[in-house]
């Protein structure tokens, strides 16, 4: 390994290597961490080097480790996109992760990351989940995804006992290039908020009629440029929308409210474009909005209530012991505060990994226990914000 500095090349070596096979590097602004897989004894060697750069302010933030990862999608390239978490309310440890595949359909995984089901229904972009809807005289949970092949809402019924998904058809929208989506539920019913690349956002009321789900357009909203990530808070009635190159906005989610937006947080030195996935974490008096800051491979937390105070940011590094690489260029993410069993007793964050390494493979999703995020940002210790 060579580094050019001070007008000359400096040579570094990793000792005790027989057959170096793969090299993974991570840089935290001050040090370079190298992990080399030795194909001879199948061990992993770590070398830490001083790697600070003069005249550059280091963008250093806490690192957390993933505890697990899902099976990969089938094809290389930009395929995996947005996860959702379905909570098995009878047996939380049997909950499922739904992951969209922009080239093929919808993947379903257990909490170990093993794929349990795949629905080859076309190019799905974003997905969200809600619970306890009556369809054809039976109670189902429901998942809705945006289908880019038909600019539609693709509906799936979820067996509340097993987590098995069933394709329940599509609802056409008025969007020309459908993109992101989130669901919202209040006393008036279940709503879907699909958005398009033009900045248009539609609000659809979803109702069961016979053995199918039908939709009615009830409201239109707008941001100036391309959005994608969004999340609705059923309790507070707030709809958060990420405008990728600009800011996170909040709208009233109720269909009878004005379509007027308020800025939550804007692109800055701490939040980098693209703004991608958004998710909400609620536990006791903690109410956080989690944001994918894709441009600098990090995640931002702000309060999910006015004045939307800054809480901190972090990155997801590699778990060497488990052979799981770190995460970069995250599109979608999802979080739950439900106790899913160890190690997810305080909840779970699931993120899409844009570059799946160690070894090089198609994209997948990484799982992070909320406890490590809570510890890294000192969220439970006091009310201060942290870098």
Outline where the language-model segments fall.
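Sequence/structural signature of beta-propeller domains
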Residues: 1-387
């Amino acid at each position: 390994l060579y580094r050019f500095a001070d007008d000359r090349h400096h040579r570094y070596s990793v000792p005790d290597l027989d057959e170096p096979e793969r090299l993974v590097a991570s840089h935290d602004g001050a040090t370079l961490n190298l992990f080399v897989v030795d194909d001879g004894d199948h061990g992993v060697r770590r070398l830490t080097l001083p790697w600070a750069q003069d005249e550059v302010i280091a963008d250093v933030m806490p690192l957390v480790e993933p505890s697990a990862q899902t099976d990969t999608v089938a094809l290389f390239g930009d395929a995996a996109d947005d996860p959702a978490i379905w909570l098995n309310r009878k047996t939380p440890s049997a909950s499922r992760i739904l992951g969209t595949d922009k080239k093929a359909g919808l993947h379903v995984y257990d909490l170990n990351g093993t794929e349990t089901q795949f629905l080859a229904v076309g190019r799905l972009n974003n997905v969200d989940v809600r619970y306890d809807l009556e369809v054809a005289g039976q109670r189902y949970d429901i998942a809705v995804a945006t289908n880019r092949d038909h600019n539609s809402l693709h509906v799936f019924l979820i067996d509340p006992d097993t987590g098995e998904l069933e394709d329940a058809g599509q609802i056409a929208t008025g969007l020309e290039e459908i993109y992101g989506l989130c669901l919202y539920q209040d006393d008036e019913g279940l709503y879907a908020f699909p958005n398009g690349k033009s900045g248009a956002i539609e609000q659809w009321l979803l109702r069961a009629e016979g053995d199918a789900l039908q939709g009615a357009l009830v409201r239109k909203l707008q941001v100036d440029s391309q959005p994608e990530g969004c999340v609705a808070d059923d309790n507070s009635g707030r709809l958060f929308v990420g405008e990728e190159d600009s800011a996170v906005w909040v709208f009233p989610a109720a269909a009878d409210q004005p379509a007027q937006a308020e800025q939550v947080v804007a692109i800055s030195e701490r939040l980098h474009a693209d703004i991608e996935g958004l998710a909400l974490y609620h536990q006791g008096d903690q109410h956080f909005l989690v944001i994918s800051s894709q441009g600098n491979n990090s995640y931002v937390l702000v309060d999910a209530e006015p004045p939307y105070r800054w809480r901190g940011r972090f990155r997801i590094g590699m778990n060497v012991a488990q052979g799981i690489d770190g995460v970069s260029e995250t599109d979608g993410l999802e979080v739950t505060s439900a106790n899913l069993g160890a190690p997810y007793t305080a909840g779970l964050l699931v993120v899409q990994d844009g570059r799946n390494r160690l070894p090089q493979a198609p994209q997948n999703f990484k799982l992070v226990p909320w406890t490590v995020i809570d510890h890294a940002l000192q969220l439970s210790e006091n009310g201060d914000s942290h870098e």
